A protein has these predicted regions:
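Non-catalytic terminal/accessory segments
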Residues: 1-143
């Protein structure tokens, strides 16, 4: 498990974070920092996929959204340090797409998921948490 690497050039994963070179969005300068590792993002995506499988179609949409929110908020609270905006946006897009697909399967709607269930419906009516908006204004999250 022990591994040596040169930090400016190489990266290493530890406790779900990838440590290595990051770039400032304002100045473009490189600095040593952290970001969520690909493995931790993949694990969260697998969890979202599992929570929105076809076998859960008999459950209420609010229950599914509560479980998704619990998972997303917990993950976002742990991974709130460093440049997380790219990871938050990709996870948010995946969660919205899976929830739309789940709703279409539940209500037997073959097409028109984005028209039938727009973002406003998912966020305001069902109460899905929006990850990119969670950490706006926090100086350490750099979102």
């Amino acid at each position: 498990k022990t591994r040596l690497c040169r930090l400016p050039e190489g990266t290493f994963d530890f406790l779900g974070y990838t440590f290595g070179r990051c770039y400032s969005t304002q100045t473009g300068k490189a600095y040593l920092g952290t970001r969520p590792s690909k493995k931790s993002i993949k694990r969260l995506i697998d969890s979202i996929h599992e929570q929105t499988e076809r076998r859960t179609l008999l459950q209420e949409a609010t229950l599914i959204v509560e479980r998704l929110n619990r998972t997303l908020i917990g993950w976002a609270n742990y991974f709130s340090l460093g440049p997380v905006s790219k990871a938050y946006r990709s996870i948010d897009a995946y969660a919205k797409a899976r929830l739309r697909r789940w709703l279409c399967n539940k209500h037997k709607a073959s097409s028109g998921a984005y028209i039938r269930y727009p973002d406003a419906y998912l966020y305001e009516h069902l109460g899905l948490v929006c990850l990119p908006k969670r950490t706006q204004g926090l100086p350490w999250a750099k979102v």
